[in-house]
């Protein structure tokens, strides 16, 4: 028994001369928020941006809806040219005589042309509201009938009206382009 094979366990005790010093609670300032909080904030910001963009798009869509959707000038020319080639100089529309819509509607009824009143009206609006047509309305220019004959000349008042109308159409086109840009952005 003199030899011990197993180590003897002893308790290490602190000396009584040292008393533990109680320190204040340390305050740790966290400079970066936790990852879950950052992710949650990003998702909230993204949802807010998407909601704002959706509201902008809805507002732009509503603002665009007040404008009449007319066919392009080329489509309007292609609609009318086969039946009334006298109204055009090549593919360029001539200045139309006053009251030509009624004449064309009568012609449609007489010749049984497969054009609805709506298509005819929209084609005439597209042509007469185009920038090239309004720019051509200068004092002294000729107006033409369905056969291509001169019926009357443009007066000073009509030229002034065309200039005012052209300004209005250009202003509307600018506004439409801005609204369309809002709709097209992501």
From Swiss-Prot:
Question: Origin, by domain of life?
Answer: Bacteria
Where are the stretches annotated Disordered? 1-20
Query: Keywords in UniProt for this one?
Result: Conjugation, Plasmid, Repressor, RNA-binding, Transcription, Transcription regulation
Q: Entry's Pfam families?
A: FinO_N, ProQ
The cross-references to InterPro entries, in alphabetical order and at most eight, read: Fertility_inhibition_FinO_N, ProQ/FinO, ProQ/FinO_sf
| Coiled-coil ranges (or none) | none
Whether Transcription regulation counts among this entry's keywords is yes
Q: Name one GO molecular function term.
A: RNA binding
The UniProt entry's sequence similarity note says: Belongs to the FinO family.
Q: What does this protein do?
A: One of the components on the FinOP fertility inhibition complex, which inhibits the expression of traJ gene, which in turn regulates the expression of some 20 transfer genes. The transfer genes are responsible for the process, called conjugal transfer, in which DNA is transmitted from one bacterial host to another. RNA-binding that interacts with the traJ mRNA and its antisense RNA, finP, stabilizing finP against endonucleolytic degradation and facilitating sense-antisense RNA recognition.
| Name of protein | Fertility inhibition protein
